Amino acid sequence: MSPHQTTGQESDNMTVNGENAQASSQYIQSNEEMTSAIATEKKASTAKAAKDPSRPKRKKAKRACYACQRGHLTCGDERPCQRCIKRGFQDACHDGVRKKAKYLHDAPNEALMAGVGATLYNQRNAAQNNANGSNTSPGAPQQITSPNFYNTQQSPDYNGFPQNKTELQDSTVGPDNYASQSPVSPTYQISQGLSTQGLSPSLPQSTSETPSAANPAPGQFNSAFFDPSDPALFNFDLASMNFGNHYGALEFGMLGHMATGVGDTPPSESGAQRGSIGQNGSGTFGLTGSNFSESPSNQAPYLFSESGMNDWTQTAPVNRRSMYGSNANLVAGNMSDKPHAFAIESAPANFASPASNESPMMTTSSATFEDTTNSGAFNSRQNVPVSQQRQQPVVSTPQLKQQNLNLGSRRRHKNASSIYDSVKDPYSYTSGFHSLTAFIQRRFSPQKTLRIAKALASIRPSFIATTKTLNRDDLIFMEKCFQRTLWEYEDFINACGTPTIVCRRTGEIAAVGKEFSILTGWKKEVLLGKEPNHNVNTGGSSGLMTGSTSRGSYTPRPYSSEVYNSSATATPRTQPVFLAELLDDDSVIEFYEDFAKLAFGDSRGSVMTTCKLLKYKTKAESDILAGSNGEADAGLNGEAASNETNELNGSLTNGATTNGRGQRRWGKGEIAGEAGMNQLGFRDGKVECSYCWTVKRDVFDIPMLIVMNVSCLCLEPLSEP
């Protein structure tokens, strides 16, 4: 039998194996199809569920319950939540407690609950306080525990001015309880046997008792008498603020209450809405129901009768020693040196400011609490009718703004846009340079005039090149830029205490500070050309100009009789003073040499050096000083002449020390104030100074103005004996 031949049994085996393999492949294929169908169906159901619009969206809960919070599970706003219901914990489901901030450690957990939880907590405490108050003995004093105010017909008798000296001292707001004073006003003790004769006529007199817990008064809450932490006191809707806790919402609302409407409402509105206290212990609180009324017409008087804070600027000073008793010397600092201020509306006792010696006190108007006679005089005052008592004027924030409280110079009401409307013509710099040239030729010697002329001639081509392409509109715009920049600089000059002066590129004074006028004696009106210039001090060897010149005859350029006139003829001029008139000869030459380098050089460069400023002296003042010095030198000996000179110069030499170079160095206290600055340069008419100046350019890159800051060196040369 050949190897390729098979038996029948082998053929049967091969057939069976082929059928098994085919069945196995069919089974595997069917399993794959079933798995694929299941996966497809699952994906379809998932996609259908994801796109189902009727599926409720999961809402983020404001606060999880305690069980879900510990298990880090998703919770809902409803109580009990769904998870606690499924687990059978619905009876123990309550809001979880969050970690408190540091400033809330002293707050109870119930008060930090969101929504109405804090209100319920306050009501439960109120019920407990009522229950405790109803158990008091009849002879015990009663307490008013309402944070809000109810009608005066239901309020008990309250003696606002006790007669006992000890009680007065206890109720007085002294300096010892400023640091530890609570923002919540203390409860007022009311005795049943208290007489109503000591009541102020402005206080309502009623004989009704305090409402009990069983019969509460309308709008009554059981807390402190004047509790600023009560949101109903300022119409705070804590639920609408969407805060997580009561204290955060109250703080936010109080800040908004303090920041809105400051100084915009008259005292009849602001004082009545927020509660005000007068200096005689009376005030007004406008209320409707249990909260403050926003409308002044709906306000009803509650407990106090005066509206608004009295004028504390016109009240006689209070005797602080009698007010605080024998401990008046222990008060730190002098209260009269501190600014006047009012405390923010936190409590009635806090209306008195600890920094004011005339601030209104809660107890009385101006009564002294140390002497018994004063107390008796105050008692007799209560019997005087209200119409005969002196009415204190009412002051409001707008009125305080109009009063002169020595707050310094205010910002002017000038509008910057008015500059662009007022400037119609360009400024004539050519005439200014002609006037400067005439002044230099008249004052300085030929050698010094030549040095100044060389410095100006070096920058003259640059001026011509930059201005030859400018038309009239460009020159007007240049002047508008100058005036706008000067308008901005005037605020800086008034704000800083450094002697400052601003001038044009011609050297004409355009702005000057008050300190510069005090230092040099030049009035602002004279420097700006608004008043005639009668100065005769040119810084010569004698320090004075007698009216004749050593240059011989000279006729200045006939520019204008009003703009420039020789000071030898004593004719007033209306042109602004040149910067060269404020400096001595050497300082003027040095200035123009530095100006030639800086005018078209470094745009942000500056020059810092020393100079001598000339004091403003008229001919009459110079003659008096010269005559006094001549008489002292001729008729007196050396010691008498020295004493006469010291008397003439005032306190010029008091306490001053001299060095080996014949100069007097001033002490810090000797030149303090305006009087000390006026003494500088009294003898020779010169003030030794160091100054720093810079050049500001306009949009055409042309020097526009010169800003100069001056500082005194406190060195005064001694006159020769």
Swiss-Prot record:
GO BP: cellular response to starvation; gluconeogenesis
DNA-binding region ranges: 65-93
UniProt protein name: Transcription activator of gluconeogenesis ARB_05058
This protein's UniProt keywords: Activator, DNA-binding, Gluconeogenesis, Metal-binding, Nucleus, Transcription, Transcription regulation, Zinc
Family to which the UniProt record says this protein belongs: Belongs to the ERT1/acuK family.
CDD domains assigned to the protein according to its UniProt record, in alphabetical order: GAL4 (cd00067)
Matching Pfam families: PAS_13
Location of the protein in the cell: Nucleus
